[in-house]
Amino acid sequence: LSVDAAEVYYESAGQNWERAAMIKARPIAGDLESGSAFMKGLRPFVWRRSLDFNAIQDIQSIKRQIDRKQGREPPSAFGHNVKLGRGGIREIEFYAQTQQLIWGGRDASLRDCGTLPALAALVRAGHVAANVQADLETAYRKLRTIEHRLQMVDDRQTHMTPEADEAYGFARFAGYE
């Protein structure tokens, strides 16, 4: 697929979930200059100056699909998915990206690929309350720390907190008393 063909695809048939995914996209290897040019070409696709109600409904539909797949059980200390579960990492990222898609077409200062910098920019622009951003940042940092500790325990990618019989040892390992 050529760069031109990819740009035509996104302009003519790109989906809203792809717009959200492209918020975090950036060139990291290979021809960085060409990668940057490609990302620049996608800006009109990702950062629309106006967002219609169908796009907002589509974004909400994506969230509902995630919720159905994961279930909507209240978070539990035991056996909870810190990444995809209720109140998890992806919910915070999804919130930030949705706000970016809503406001970022008219305000380039909101187009950061990082979740925490994006939330801070949304506060500066007056779109997110400072206390909401502070709570989300605290939760995001704690969840990421727990995620990393979970992965260190078994030396594999996992996002599930341990069941009750292993929880105490993990909590101590993660720095909790």
Predicted stretch roles:
Residues 1-177:
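A nucleotide- and high-energy phosphate-metabolite-utilizing enzyme signature
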